Regions:
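Sec-dependent N-terminal signal peptides
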Residues: 4-15
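Short, internal strand/loop/helix patches
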Residues: 23, 28, 97-132
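A short beta-strand-turn-helix
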Residues: 25-45
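Hydrophobic beta-strand anchors of alpha/beta hydrolase catalytic cores
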Residues: 47-48, 80, 127
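Thiol-/selenol-based redox modules, centered on thioredoxin-like
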Residues: 129-156
Length: 156
């Protein structure tokens, strides 16, 4: 009985720890260093979306969110961070694409896939919602038209 109790407590602790962001050093599209473990939003939610310039479903998802993002910001104060997994030779495509679409998201670069691996992201698009305390409350791989409603519900 004691073993079961100890194992249960260990499992709960592991789940709690894994619900926090791992700390990985990345750069934004302007060359500024960012520690992912320090990502926060003053008690408001954060969306982290892994994407790539060559990923058509990623682009559809980010364009769809772009349409509703100003409303989400007004209603929830959400902060949106998109993490490009484009490899080093393709990183120079990221900023022109973001600027071309008029996205006002924060953009981080993960050319070596360190943050992607730390978050156990297998494919893109892959989106996480963090609550105001930095805990992952929503985790979704892939994109389906209309999926923004599920994301919005996770922000509440």
């Amino acid at each position: 009985m004691k073993k079961i109790l100890v194992l249960s407590i260990m499992a709960i602790c592991a789940l709690t720890i894994s619900a926090q962001l791992p700390n990985v050093k990345l750069q934004d599209i302007n060359g500024k260093t960012v520690q992912t473990g320090e990502i926060s939003n003053d008690g408001k939610p954060v969306i982290i979306s892994f994407w790539a310039t060559w990923c058509k479903p990623c682009l559809r998802e980010l364009k769809a969110i772009h349409e509703v993002y100003p409303d989400w910001q007004d209603e929830t104060g959400v902060r949106m961070i998109i993490v490009s997994i484009d490899q080093a030779q393709d990183v120079n495509r990221v900023k022109p694409m973001v600027d071309g679409f008029g996205w006002e998201y924060e953009v981080l670069l993960d050319p070596n896939g360190d943050f992607k691996r730390a978050m156990n992201v297998q494919n893109v698009p892959h989106l996480f919602v963090l609550d105001g305390k930095g805990k992952i409350v929503y985790n979704h791989a892939g994109y389906v038209d209309g999926g923004e409603e599920d994301i919005y519900n996770a922000l509440q």
